Amino acid sequence: MGAPHNKKRYGELWPSYRIQYALEILVSLKDVVILSGGWAWHFLSPLNHTEYKHAHDHKDIDLFVDPKNVAEVMNILLENNFQKVWTRYDQLPSDENFRRYEKTILTEDEKSVRVTIDFFVKSNIPNRMAKGWSIVEPSYLLGLYSNIHSSDKCWAVQSVIKLLDQNIDPLDREELVTIPKN
């Protein structure tokens, strides 16, 4: 579970290049993955929303990959110069089939940007379409914050909990990207 947010930092934005570089690889993976975590919340949010850091997490890209699509996903990542990165989780006994791939991009102003993709190999993930993207079904996604996701304090997560409690579909709801009043 994530630490409480520092409310003084609520107006901070994700750099546009981070969104751009992530979307570039996601487009090539679109037909063979299910988006999870921050990118699922991103596509549930209204179009052209402000990319507040506390609305949803764009530090990495969390994906679910059906076992039958793993080879294709790995080929796409390798063709796009992503490399396998070993993590401490690779050595731990787990039911999760987890893989991390990273790529470092040098921007025009010579800043290094790391794009990290965490993917979990699993079939039968409840999912739905949002703006042409396959995303983890929000009610199922909320349950992942107890084991594979950690940004449970983001506004999108907190808003979706409330919306689903009222049987309201979270798709395109402003609450997902609105700075909380309290």
Give the positions of each predicted feature.
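Catalytic cores of NTP-dependent nucleotidyl/adenyl transfer enzymes across multiple folds
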Residues: 4-5, 111-182
